Amino acid sequence: DHIIVGGETQHSSKLEVFSGGKGLNQSIALAKAGVPVYHAGIVGTDGDILLDACKEAGVNTKYIRRLPVKGGHTMIQVDKNAQNCIILYGGTNQMQTKEFVDEVLADFGEGDYLILQNEINMLDYIIDQAYEKKMKIVMNPSPFDDKLSTCDLSKVHLFLLNEIEGEQ
């Protein structure tokens, strides 16, 4: 009915489980539009739903690694007016390493597009390395947080902004 507030308990009318995350959703949308897409990231032991969604959409999963821990999760609460509230648990999304980033970016270069979102770690390093390789960097800075202050956002060619983050 409404977005829950602190100290409140509320019944839910339904529970739905989907694969997703901004990065995965963008990769799938581009692949369905006919663009060759390589998705990079780290999934946990619970990542089969994500890998299956990639394969079904034609997304190349060569750069997806699996770790023996829980992956990232998102809980989205939607009220009767379709407004939402989103809570993130980073999990494996926060486990990128410089070595992994370097391994992925080694196969890409000038003119290739890199699409990022602020639900992963190492953004400053990823942006710097991609910029040095003259890649085109597209970024959704959501969730807008202090981590972005470590990034040289002047190296980003295009921003994809959500309503709230656009106001910030």
What is the predicted function of each stretch?
Residues 25, 45-49, 70, 121-122, ...:
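Short alpha-helical
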Residues 75:
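C-terminal catalytic lobe of FAD-dependent flavoproteins
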Residues 1-40, 49:
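Glycine-rich phosphate/adenosyl-contacting loop at the front of the ribokinase-like
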Residues 14-16, 38-45, 58-72, 140-142:
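Beta-strand->loop->alpha-helix junctions that form or flank phosphate-binding loops
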Residues 17-20, 24, 71, 127, ...:
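Hydrophobic alpha-helical segments
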Residues 4, 44, 79:
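Acidic surface patches and DE-rich sequence motifs
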Residues 19-20, 45, 95:
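A structural motif shared across PLP-dependent enzymes of the aminotransferase-like
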Residues 52-66, 78-168:
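Ribokinase/PfkB-type carbohydrate-kinase core domain
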